[in-house]
Amino acid sequence: PLLTDASFSEDFAASVFLVLMLFGIVGRIFSGKLGDIIGALPTYILMSIGQTITVLGFPYIDFKIGLFIIAAAFGFTYSGVMSAILVCARMMVSAKLAGRAMALGSFFGWVGMGLGGYFGGLLFDIKGDYTWSFQFASLMGSVNLLILWQFHLRIKAKQEVIA
């Protein structure tokens, strides 16, 4: 709705969404490879940073090439986040609990996306534009990053004690 409300055609809006989804495929593959190199949690953090930053750009970019670029960047990092959640769950729990951990990670990821859409729509209804909705999404991404960073510090501290 953001693009059609901004007077772009439905065909153009669908093209932007297609680019977002195609780069999501690339991001999923890339994040898997990156996770092999730097680890699952650092990959999750990097992809979350990208998603948190790029989501802010959508309501401010009003030219076609810019929308394709921001859609590509967001799709790339968004899908990297989703795959990194599952890899983190698998890497950080025993094999006995892996299925449950991945299911819970997926569940809360989907609940978060659903609530994000709900609150984004609610903010649009209250404010009458998309700016607050996308800022809220970025704020929630920042909260996620704070949690991930605390998790990272905790793991690092435990590794230092063991070493």
For the regions a language model picked out, list residue spans one by one.
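Short amphipathic helix-loop junctions that connect adjacent transmembrane helices
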Residues: 1-11
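Residue-level signature of mid-helix packing/kink "hotspots" within the transmembrane helices
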Residues: 21-29, 110-114
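Helix-to-loop junctions at the C-terminal end of transmembrane segments
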Residues: 27-39, 124-125
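C-terminal ends and interior cores of transmembrane alpha-helices
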Residues: 50-62
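Helix-loop junctions at membrane interfaces in 12-TM secondary transporters
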Residues: 60-70
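Intracellular juxtamembrane helix-capping segments at the cytosolic ends
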Residues: 80-93
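A late C-terminal transmembrane helix in Major Facilitator Superfamily
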Residues: 90-129, 137
